[in-house]
């Protein structure tokens, strides 16, 4: 995956997207019971750093990892602005490494789906397991094929000065891949300059994820359907799943 794939998404992510509340509610249920025993954490595919900064603000020694240099730059800037210690690492989730093992690794906003091949899941989980303390937990959410079938077959538009975005998503029925063509229109004076990005995702069956987690050394697997947390038309039952897994001691 090219490191600049989300250059424009990074630049305007906080300006355009407001998906935080459903994830905050999910964290209370899924991560909340673990927090008293979490002293070190890593947010994998950290985006613009919201969750990593939240951990750091609670006194958790935190790492933030993202492939996008622009996402990393924004996250570092936010940490400096509020005076929080946060180690930001620019790395591919399929081959990242941390300076030390941690108690918790998170990977939100279906970031785990953003790999080129289904076989890459094993590579991601191998790195996650290596970065966790024995008994540590991995918490992530993943889009399922139903999400591709229902939500990745439309066009989404948003306009918030100085940028507008058109996202056209496609999914070939019966496959485990989906693609979005993203057109950014950034205002420059009286004109708009157009920029393009391509976003691709793959998905796995429940059984495939279970097998991959077990083979990577995880146990105590638990899942939650995302629909009750989101309560919107794009996240129907079966579309997105939250996962929690423990690295075997």
Report the location of each language-model feature.
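Residues lining the SAM
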Residues: 108-110
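SAM-dependent methyltransferase
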Residues: 139-211
């Amino acid at each position: 995956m090219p490191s600049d794939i989300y250059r424009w998404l990074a630049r305007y992510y906080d300006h355009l997207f407001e998906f935080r509340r459903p994830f905050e509610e999910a964290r209370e249920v899924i991560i909340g019971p673990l927090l008293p025993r979490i002293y070190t954490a890593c947010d994998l595919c950290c985006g613009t750093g919201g969750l990593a900064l939240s951990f750091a603000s609670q006194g958790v020694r935190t790492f933030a990892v993202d492939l996008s240099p622009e996402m990393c730059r924004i996250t570092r800037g936010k940490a400096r602005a509020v005076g929080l210690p946060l180690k930001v690492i620019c790395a591919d989730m399929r081959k990242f490494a941390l300076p030390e093992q941690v108690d918790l690794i998170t990977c939100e906003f279906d970031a785990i789906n953003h790999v080129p091949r289904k076989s890459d899941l094993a590579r991601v989980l191998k790195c996650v397991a290596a970065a966790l303390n024995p008994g540590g937990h991995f918490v992530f959410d993943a889009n399922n094929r139903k999400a591709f079938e229902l939500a990745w077959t439309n066009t989404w538009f948003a306009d918030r000065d100085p940028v507008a975005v058109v996202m056209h998503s496609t999914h070939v029925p019966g496959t485990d891949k989906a693609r979005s063509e993203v057109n950014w229109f950034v205002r420059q004076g009286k004109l708009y300059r157009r920029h393009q990005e391509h976003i691709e995702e793959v998905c796995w069956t429940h059984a495939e994820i279970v097998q991959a987690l077990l083979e990577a050394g995880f146990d105590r697997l638990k899942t939650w359907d995302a629909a009750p947390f989101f309560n919107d038309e794009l996240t129907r039952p079966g579309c997105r799943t939250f996962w929690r897994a423990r690295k075997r001691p």
